[in-house]
A protein has these predicted regions:
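Conserved metal-binding segment of the jelly-roll/cupin
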Residues: 90-112
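Non-catalytic, conserved peripheral segments adjacent to functional cores
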Residues: 1-94, 113-142
Length: 142
């Protein structure tokens, strides 16, 4: 089921024999709110990261290298899609950004040797703004 507010948006990809160019974000993009921080997150084969939920920040994700599989669960109690789940894959072949609004739990993994995730948040990360858990519903992160 589609979670309200989750968007996977194709972005430009420029093939080049010297190395491809992958667009990430422009301040002109309709989904761009503001710049807070950018993180590059490496993930190794079959490892899982998460569960994470931002209380105020929107995440804009893109894959810089490899392929990443996301598990998303709506944690917004007043949402029509509360507790619903969605699986989304990002990779270079179908280059896209994934917009995750505040209140959505997410985790991610890769089936590649290594993948790199880029995450732009519209505010600054803090312990008060970010919630982490090892288990959401029946899904565990070790």
């Amino acid at each position: 089921m589609k979670i309200i507010g989750i968007k996977k948006i194709p972005v430009k990809f420029f093939e080049n024999s010297k190395g491809d160019l992958l667009k990430f974000v422009s301040k002109k993009d309709h989904f761009f709110k503001s710049f807070g921080e950018v993180y590059f997150n490496e993930i190794n084969y079959k490892k899982k990261k998460g569960w994470i939920k931002h209380l105020k920040n929107q995440c804009i994700f893109s894959v810089a290298f490899g392929e990443i599989n996301f598990k998303l669960i709506d944690g917004r109690i007043k949402s029509k899609t509360f507790d619903k789940e969605e699986n989304i894959t990002l990779n270079k072949n179908k280059h896209s950004v994934l917009i995750v609004p505040p209140g959505i739990w997410f985790s991610f993994t890769t089936n590649k040797k290594k993948s790199i995730l880029v995450n732009l948040i519209n505010g600054t990360n803090s312990l008060e703004e970010t919630v982490k858990s090892k288990k959401i519903k029946n899904y565990y992160i070790k």
